[in-house]
UniProtKB/Swiss-Prot annotation:
It is found in: Cytoplasm. PANTHER family: DEVELOPMENTALLY REGULATED GTP-BINDING PROTEIN-RELATED, MITOCHONDRIAL RIBOSOME-ASSOCIATED GTPASE 2. GO terms for cellular component: cytoplasm. It comes from Sinorhizobium medicae (strain WSM419) (Ensifer medicae). The keyword GTP-binding applies. Mg(2+) binds at residues 173, 193. This is GTPase Obg. Monomer. Belongs to the TRAFAC class OBG-HflX-like GTPase superfamily. OBG GTPase family.
C-alpha cells in the first residue's frame, strides 16, 4: 500500500430545498388557502476517525466531496426531505486544517470521533408561512439557502506508543519486524524505509504500538533527506527508542547527530523519554562491543541497551523497558 500523509480536498455541503407555492384544492372549498411546505435542509459534510486506516491514500483518487441538496417542499404542507450527508473517513490521528494549512479545525484523536466540517443550507419557507391578515393567498416562497464550500487540508500524524529513531541503516525496520508482525522493506542500504511503518509488539501479554520512520541524517530538520517529513509521526508517541548501529565507526557522533536533529525539529521531541540502544551487536566481537558500548554510554549519559534483532539478544529487555515508560506515561495522563 502506498503511503500518503497530507492531501488537499474540496468539500461542499448541500443547498437547502426550495419552499413550495401551493394552494389547498378540495371539493366544496372554494378558497382553500396556501399549503406550500418548506424545503428540506441540505446534507452536511462530516469527518470521522476510523480504525484500520493508516494512510490518506484514498484521497489521492477522490478530492471533491459534495453533499446532496435538500428536497423541495410540496403541497399539503409537506416538508422536503433532508439531503444526504457525506462522511470523510480518515485514520485516527488525522488533523484537519483550513486552506492556509496552518489554522487547525479539528484533531481526530479517537476512534469514532465525528466532526461536522460544513453544515447544509436551510430549506426555504413555503408560501403557507407568508399567509397574513392582509394577504390570504401569497404566491411566493423562499429558495433554499446555499451550502458551505471550502478547501481543507488533511494531515496525518500516526498515533503510536513508541517511536523508533536513528540514522539510516540503524536496524529500525529489522527491529520492528523482529518484535511485531509488521513486514517493512529491509535491505542493506540507506533509506530502504521510505514511509512510516506501524507494528504491534507484545511483551508479558501486554500490547503496544511501535512506529518506524525513515532514518534521519544531518540537516534533516532543514529538509535534507526524507526523515524530517515524517518526524511528525513520532510527536504523539510516549517514548522514543533511539537505535545506534554497532556498524558505525563513531557511535557517539551517530547518537549526537540524531539528538541534534530532534532538538532542532522541535515539537517536544527533545523532551520525550528516550531509551538508547546499540543495535546489530552480532557483527562485533567482545572487545569491540565493550568499546563501542562505553563510547555510546558516555555520549548519552547512561549505559545503552545492547540488542540484536537477528539473534534476539536483548529484545525482550528492550520491549520491557519501553513498556515500563509507556505505562508510567499513561498513569500520569490518567492522574492529570
Amino acid at each position: 500500500m502506498k503511503f500518503l500523509d497530507e492531501t488537499k480536498v474540496y468539500i461542499r455541503s448541500g443547498d437547502g430545498g426550495a419552499g413550495a407555492v401551493s394552494f389547498r384544492r378540495e371539493k366544496f372549498i372554494e378558497f382553500g388557502g396556501p399549503d406550500g411546505g418548506d424545503g428540506g435542509r441540505g446534507g452536511d459534510v462530516w469527518v470521522e476517525a476510523v480504525n484500520g486506516l493508516n494512510t490518506l491514500i484514498d484521497f489521492r483518487y477522490q478530492q471533491h466531496f459534495k453533499a446532496k441538496t435538500g428536497t423541495h417542499g410540496m403541497g399539503r404542507n409537506r416538508t422536503g426531505a433532508k439531503g444526504a450527508d457525506v462522511t470523510l473517513k480518515v485514520p485516527v490521528g488525522t488533523q484537519i486544517f483550513e486552506e492556509d494549512s496552518e489554522t487547525l479545525i479539528v484533531d481526530m484523536v479517537a476512534e469514532g470521533q465525528r466532526y461536522r466540517l460544513a453544515a447544509g443550507g436551510n430549506g426555504g419557507f413555503g408560501n403557507a408561512h407568508f399567509k397574513s391578515s392582509t394577504n390570504q393567498a401569497p404566491n411566493w416562497a423562499n429558495p433554499g439557502l446555499e451550502g458551505e464550500e471550502k478547501t481543507i487540508w488533511l494531515r496525518l500524524k500516526l498515533i503510536a506508543d513508541a517511536g523508533l529513531v536513528g540514522l539510516p541503516n540503524a536496524g529500525k525496520s529489522t527491529f520492528l519486524a523482529a518484535c511485531t508482525r509488521a513486514r517493512p522493506k529491509i535491505a542493506n542500504y540507506p533509506f530502504t524505509t521510505l514511509h512510516p511503518n506501524l507494528g504491534v509488539a507484545t511483551v508479558d501479554e501486554k500490547e503496544f504500538i511501535i512506529a518506524d520512520i525513515p532514518g534521519l541524517i544531518e540537516g534533516a530538520h532543514e529538509g535534507v533527506g526524507i526523515g524530517d517529513r515524517f518526524l511528525g509521526h513520532v510527536e504523539r508517541t510516549r517514548v522514543l527508542l533511539h537505535l545506534v548501529s554497532a556498524q558505525e565507526e563513531d557511535v557517539a557522533k551517530a547518537y549526537k547527530t540524531v539528538k541534534h536533529e530532534l532538538e532542532a525539529y522541535g515539537g517536544g521531541l527533545e523532551e520525550k523519554p528516550q531509551i538508547v540502544a546499540l543495535s546489530q551487536i552480532d557483527v562485533l566481537d567482545e572487545a569491540e562491543l565493550k568499546a563501542k558500548s562505553k563510547a555510546l554510554g558516555k555520549a548519552c549519559g547512561t549505559p545503552p541497551l545492547l540488542i540484536s534483532a537477528v539473534t534476539n539478544k536483548g529484545m525482550t529487555e528492550t520491549l520491557r523497558a519501553l513498556r515500563s515508560v509507556i505505562d508510567a506515561a499513561k498513569a500520569g495522563e490518567e492522574d492529570a
